[in-house]
Amino acid sequence: NLPTPAWAQGLAKKMVLVITGGEPSLQRNLSAFLEKAQPYFQQTQIESNGSSILPDLPENTTLVVSPKCLEKDGAIIRYLKPNIKMLERADYLKFVMSAPEDNHYTPYSEIPTWAHEWAEKTKKQVFVSPMNRYLREPQRVQKIRDKGRDLTLEERSEINEVVSFWEPGLLDLKKNQRNHEYAAEYCMKHGLILNLQIHLFASLP
């Protein structure tokens, strides 16, 4: 409940408007909305899985394509290659990565070849986020669900979306340590950018 600081008020706020999942490309009039939003923010950005084309996306809107993995019968098969037009428009690619378990590699254990080829061809950057594993839901969320009711929109914003790396017993620290170290080493080996979920460390929404 902090007051809105001066830098976050009025036109040309010193902040970036980021639109992300679900899948933003499924929303109607998204490009028109981004066009209207330009004067109010320092920059606009959208994160999409790249499966659907975003027509008329403003040129100065940053497009981050974050491909998803195909799953079948609960098994992870492979990363889905985005639509070719989305790859051509993309400013960055972003992937989630986890370390192999018991020497068993999954699609989350490496970046697909086509992404390395895209980076080499376009000279654009690829970001890699270590996967964070959870042991349970945050305590406040669990208490509300135990009462037999769903979270309100306000609660989803103020409670459900606030997750802290420091809440005891919430995250699987051993697996997360392996994932962070593995992703960092992979990035150094291949010249990619390590992208951490900083809001978890600062207990921010």
Where are these regions (language model features)?
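Active-site beta-strand/loop signature of hydrolases that rely on acidic residues for catalysis
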Residues: 21-23
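Conserved AdoMet/S-adenosylmethionine-binding subsite of the radical SAM
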Residues: 25-205
